[in-house]
């Protein structure tokens, strides 16, 4: 049944194209190379290019055709001379032309299966006596096939050869389809599949940030599957396809000129990715030259490093990036090929045509009106460059030879010749047990490293290694320069790349955003965006997102992250500090001077009469208020913050408790004199001190409880409108600080009330009058301070300075209104600081260890009558 299936397939194939390829047609003129051997390898090469119109074949393909064909012959010669590889076994060849067409290649490949059919049905050729009939044109039995070149050719041929279990090794077919072992189970290749190349091309685009490109593919398996693999890799890297074009020979496809026009419709897609056969690439570049179009081409190995593709259109291809399979030139082949000429190469029937085409001459007189070829013409370095896949052709032939060698050693261990077990090859065994398992160092490779190993993976594919070339103009000469390589990862020498406009081209749907802008992607298109500036306090988390650094942080110069802003606070050298500190120092010195004067003249009548105990307490409070400036200017810390909260209210409490005690005493004394009451209680100096300390203690207790409930500390504070500034402040609200002064306000109000009540005392009693001046002025200062404090809350410098100056002014008011007159008399009018006469009090006298209101001390200057009662003034009438 199996034999009938093969016969039916072969018969259908033969008759579908007529009898030109049948066994009995002797009129069909076929160009082929047949060299007999013990084992014969088939060969398929694009010796000629595609024909135009109705012609099957066109001009000679000098590089990919003739060179590759001769590479196979060269490899066969070397193997046959090798004493270690297949010794005693001669390899033969049967080489056919594919004309760069898959259908034509399939017709040619039928020759390879004729021998298999003959062996299968050999009984039909036996004579009645048991002998075999004499046959003409007996086909050679093919052990394996080397080829084809184009993926479309290899796919068609592989579908045929698998039916007859003939192994096939391609040296150039890279379509990913051929890795499918369920369909191409006798196919192997010394080159990698296209998805490696597609990945390399996508990485090149990503490397240069080309995210918006056009693509052009050749019709057929190579171009279509290759560009499909590229599109998958591009999507993974957020690369968008502006337009995808396809070219081919069929009438439904666009012409090359129309493809160029379509590409020009996408002006932002300056990079064009080509996955095309060499002939299609040449035509497209020529069309671009006609349209004077300028693109940056990124091309697959279909273009590679071929001079023929860009010939005549070099200016259009300038700056192109092309890929070629990584290979080493076979120098022995160079010597072999350069030794060939039409007079010594008779086994190659296409060589004469190649010679005439290459040198534009004729080997026969008056042929095509060409000049006669000079017999001294030769192939040399001036007119020859080794084609890039010669190494892969040689490796393919050697791979088949190594597999046959191991099979022969296994099946025929006692001989170097072919034994009966190999007379009819088991192609399945050869492929699976030997070919896929070969592992040898590439012949003629000077580098004995990992890259020189020839082996196949489980899919029969070669290793993925590519060279990256740049087409450039150096010194007026165009050439390809290797600028990198790809072997799972990309490596490029960017400095060696020449661009058509002397700078790396851009190929993006939208212009690049500024360093401080993010991309706002357009719906449905990951490559087109609108640039939106980030706020000054935002950094770029990625190219699509601006992220808030958060309070207290600021983006770095390159917007890649954030850093902690330095803490801002008033420093001693700031102008905002110098003014308040100067005022506070002046006030503190004045306070110290007053204290010094009072201590020095402590026992003089004026000091005694002033209530010196309360005066010292009052002066201590004034001095403490000046010290508060230093606490508010100092860098905030838990200790400083505690001192601020404790000292501000306490300093005022000390001052106004002393004043309240004094005004209350005066008021009670005059009320007692006025009403004729008994001597008021608690008017002795010690009583007044205890009353004053009690009032102060209330404030201290309140602040202490506050400190316990809300522990002092610092916080980093940022205003919404000034995010770039981080203010180091105490962790207490401004409102809380003012609330803590509530008790002091009560003291001020009470002092003011008592000062107002004693305003009608005799005019010679000036103590009450000056206390009144002090309290009125203090109220004015505080009424002006409160709104200023709240209005300046947005600027901590102004607020702090206002606070310091207001506190200092309160101290100056006390010094100026209460103590300045006394100091003036003590220092400049000492004659008034004496006892001038005695005032007798009928109702009561006040006495104590310190200040005395009694008959012994009532002989002060000027007796005073208040509402008909005589009282003692604690100051003098001339103040």
Swiss-Prot record:
Q: Which residues form the signal peptide?
A: 1-24
Which pairs of positions does the record mark as disulfide bonds?
Answer: 57-99, 240-527, 361-373, 412-419, 509-528, 513-531, 534-546, 549-562
Glycan-linked positions: 209, 292, 414, 439
Q: Which residues lie on this side of the membrane: Extracellular?
A: 25-577, 635-688, 757-769, 829-879
Per the record, the similarity remark reads:
Belongs to the G-protein coupled receptor 3 family.
**Complex formation:** Interacts with TAMALIN.
Q: What is this protein called?
A: Metabotropic glutamate receptor 3
User: Which gene name does the record give?
Assistant: GRM3
């Amino acid at each position: 049944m199996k034999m009938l299936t093969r016969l039916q397939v072969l018969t259908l194939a033969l008759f579908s194209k007529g009898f030109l390829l049948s066994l009995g047609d002797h009129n069909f003129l076929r160009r082929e190379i047949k060299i007999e051997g013990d084992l014969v390898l088939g060969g398929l090469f694009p010796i000629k290019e595609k024909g135009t119109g109705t012609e099957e074949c066109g001009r000679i393909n000098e590089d990919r055709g003739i060179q590759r064909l001769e590479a196979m012959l060269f490899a066969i010669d070397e193997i046959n001379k090798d004493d270690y590889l297949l010794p005693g076994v001669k390899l033969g060849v049967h080489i056919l032309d594919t004309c760069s067409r898959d259908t034509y290649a399939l017709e040619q490949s039928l020759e390879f299966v004729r021998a298999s059919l003959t062996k299968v049905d050999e009984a039909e050729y036996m004579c009645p006596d048991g002998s075999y009939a004499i046959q003409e044109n007996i086909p050679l039995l093919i052990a394996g096939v080397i080829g084809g070149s184009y993926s479309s050719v290899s796919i068609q041929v592989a579908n045929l050869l698998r039916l007859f279990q003939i192994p096939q090794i391609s040296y150039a077919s890279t379509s990913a389809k051929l890795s499918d072992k369920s369909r191409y189970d006798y196919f192997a290749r010394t080159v990698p599949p296209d998805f490696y190349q597609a990945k390399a091309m996508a990485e090149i685009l990503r490397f240069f940030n080309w995210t918006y490109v056009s693509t052009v593919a050749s019709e057929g398996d190579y171009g279509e599957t290759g560009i499909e693999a590229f599109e998958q890799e591009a999507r993974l890297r957020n690369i968008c396809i502006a337009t995808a074009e396809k070219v081919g020979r069929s009438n439904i496809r666009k012409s090359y000129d129309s493809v160029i026009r379509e590409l020009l419709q996408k002006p932002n897609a300056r990079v064009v990715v080509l996955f095309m056969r060499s002939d299609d690439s040449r035509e497209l570049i020529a069309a671009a030259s006609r349209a004077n179009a300028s693109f940056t081409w990124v091309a697959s190995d279909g273009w590679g490093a071929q001079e023929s593709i860009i010939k005549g259109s070099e200016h259009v291809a300038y700056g192109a990036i092309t890929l070629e399979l990584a290979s080493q030139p076979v120098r022995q082949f160079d010597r072999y090929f350069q030794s060939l000429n039409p007079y010594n190469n008779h086994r190659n029937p296409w060589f004469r045509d190649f010679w005439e085409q290459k040198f534009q001459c004729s080997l026969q007189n008056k042929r095509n009106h060409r000049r006669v070829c000079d017999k001294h013409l030769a192939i040399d370095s001036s007119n020859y460059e080794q084609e890039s896949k010669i190494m892969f052709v040689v490796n393919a032939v050697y791979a088949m030879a190594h597999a046959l060698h191991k099979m022969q050693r296994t099946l025929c261990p006692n001989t170097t010749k072919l034994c009966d077990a190999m007379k009819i090859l088991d192609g399945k065994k050869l492929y699976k047990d030997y070919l896929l398992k070969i592992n040898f160092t590439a012949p003629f490779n000077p580098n004995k490293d990992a890259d020189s190993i020839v082996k196949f993976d489980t899919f029969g594919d070669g290793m993925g290694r590519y060279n990256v070339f740049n087409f450039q103009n150096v010194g007026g000469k165009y050439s390809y320069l290797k600028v990198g390589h790809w072997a799972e990862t990309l490596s490029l020498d960017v400095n060696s790349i020449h661009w058509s406009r002397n700078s790396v081209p851009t190929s993006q749907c939208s212009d690049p955003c500024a360093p401080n802008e993010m991309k706002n992607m357009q719906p449905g298109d990951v490559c087109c965006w609108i640039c939106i500036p980030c706020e000054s306090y935002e950094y770029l988390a990625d190219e699509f997102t601006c992220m808030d650094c958060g309070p207290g942080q600021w983006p770095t110069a390159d917007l890649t992250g954030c850093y902690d802003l330095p803490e801002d606070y008033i420093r001693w050298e700031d102008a905002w500090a110098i003014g308040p500190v100067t005022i506070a120092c002046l006030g503190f010195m004045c306070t110290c001077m007053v204290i010094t004067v009072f201590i020095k003249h402590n026992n003089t009548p004026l000091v005694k009469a002033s209530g010196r105990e309360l005066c010292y307490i009052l002066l201590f409070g004034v001095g403490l208020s000046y010290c508060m400036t230093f606490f508010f200017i100092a860098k905030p810390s838990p200790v400083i913050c505690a001192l601020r909260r404790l000292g501000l209210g306490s300093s005022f409490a000390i001052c106004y408790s002393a004043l309240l005690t004094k005004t209350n005493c005066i008021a009670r004394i005059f009320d007692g004199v006025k009403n004729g009451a008994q001597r008021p209680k608690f008017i002795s100096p010690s009583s007044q001190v205890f009353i004053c300390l009690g009032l102060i203690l209330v404030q201290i207790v309140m602040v202490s409880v506050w400190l316990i409930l809300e522990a002092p500390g610092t916080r980093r504070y940022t205003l919404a409108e000034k995010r770039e500034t981080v203010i180091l402040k105490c962790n207490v609200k401004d409102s809380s600080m003012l609330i803590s002064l509530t008790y002091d306000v009560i003291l001020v109000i009470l002092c003011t009330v008592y000062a107002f009540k004693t305003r009608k005392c005799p005019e010679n009693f000036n103590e009450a009058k000056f206390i009144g001046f002090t309290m009125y002025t203090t109220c004015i200062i505080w009424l002006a301070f409160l709104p200023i404090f709240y209005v300046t809350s947005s600027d901590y410098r102004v607020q702090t300075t206002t606070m310091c100056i207001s506190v200092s002014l309160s101290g100056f008011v006390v010094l100026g209104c209460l103590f300045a007159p006394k100091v003036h008399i003590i220092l400049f009018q000492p004659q008034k600081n004496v006892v001038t006469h005695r005032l007798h009090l009928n109702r009561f006298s006040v006495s104590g260890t310190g200040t005395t209101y009694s008959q012994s001390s009532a002989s002060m200057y000027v007796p005073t009558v208040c509402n008909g009662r005589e009282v003692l003034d604690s100051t003098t009438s001339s103040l």
